[in-house]
Every structure is written in structure tokens, then in C-alpha cells.
Amino acid sequence: MNYFDLFSLPVIFPIDQTRLSETYRELQKQYHPDKFVMQNDSERLRAMQKSTEINDAYQTLKNSCLRAQYLLLLAGLDIALEHKTLQDTAFLVQQMEWRETIAAFTEDDQDKMDEFALQLQQQVAGLESKIEVQLQNDELEATADSIRQLKFMLKLQIELVLIEEKLFD
């Protein structure tokens, strides 16, 4: 059973996050290991495994990047453990510029940081839309490249948060 089936969701990139969360809570109640404490060892083990599967599926489906990777896996392309890098020169140059921008922020740049965070969020949203279209068109290699870009953007968002915490805490 794939993760989408487990949560009774269609196998598509955009998902109903509310429905995902509601189904997660229902499944966790149903398969929580504490409910099986009086069962035999094999039933307790089965409940623990099912609970772990539910948690893994939920973490994968709620995260757009992991969800896109999982859809690629279902389509026959596994990029989870690859070490392939982007070959998009323009994006690589943009990466360097973004990193320089983040490195240059000071305590006086809160407004600039907020603006930059908004730009990053717009980039992420654009990549997610691009991935959705690429998946619909079965453009697996192009989707893989977009996922690599999305991973970078999500890491960059985390770096920005860490810089803000360092500067303002």
C-alpha cells in the first residue's frame, strides 16, 4: 500500500493538508501501540510497525519536497539518496548571490530580511507549481531537477531563520 492509499488521498502532488492531518489523527488513534499493550507479542509488533508506517507516510506527505520525491519513486525514479548536483548554471549563480545576501545581513537589516524571506517563499511556491505541472506531464527528470532546486530553497529558508535568530537573540 502506498502512502497516498494509506491516507485515502489521490496520488497527485497537491494534497488537502487538512484531510491529511485529520486522517493521520484517526489512524494514530486506531493503531497507537498503547492500545495493543494487552495483546500478544506479534500483535504489539504489528501495531508498532503500522504506527511507524503511518508516521513515515505522514511526514512524507505533509512535506512538499518529500512528497514530490515520493511521487517520483512511485513513477520509478528514486532520487532520495542520490548525490547528483544541479547543472543549471543560472540557478547555481543565483544560489551564490542568495548566500552572499544572507551572509551580509546585519542587525539593522530586519526589513531586508523580511523582504528576502518573502522572495524565498515566492520562489518555493513557484517551484512547487512547476513540480505539479511537471509531474502531471510525466517529466520525471525535469521534476527531479526542480526538486533539487526546491531542496536548496528550503535549506536557504532555514539558513535565513538561523541568521535572524543569531542576530536578534
UniProtKB/Swiss-Prot annotation:
PANTHER family to which the protein is assigned, alphabetical: IRON-SULFUR CLUSTER CO-CHAPERONE PROTEIN HSCB (PTHR14021:SF15)
List, alphabetically, the InterPro entries matched.
Answer: DnaJ_domain, HscB, HscB_C_sf, HscB_oligo_C, J_dom_sf
Any matching Pfam family: HSCB_C
GO MF annotation, one: ATPase activator activity
Q: Where is the J domain?
A: 2-74
Reported function:
Co-chaperone involved in the maturation of iron-sulfur cluster-containing proteins. Seems to help targeting proteins to be folded toward HscA.
Alphabetically sorted, this entry's keywords are:
Chaperone
Tell me, how does this one assemble? Answer: Interacts with HscA and stimulates its ATPase activity.
Record Gene3D superfamilies: DnaJ domain (1.10.287.110), HscB, C-terminal domain (1.20.1280.20)
Q: Which family does it belong to?
A: Belongs to the HscB family.
Domain of life here? Bacteria
What protein is this chain from?
A: Co-chaperone protein HscB homolog
A GO BP annotation = protein folding
Please report the organism this UniProt entry assigns to the protein: Psychromonas ingrahamii (strain DSM 17664 / CCUG 51855 / 37)
Any GO CC annotation of this UniProt entry: iron-sulfur cluster transfer complex
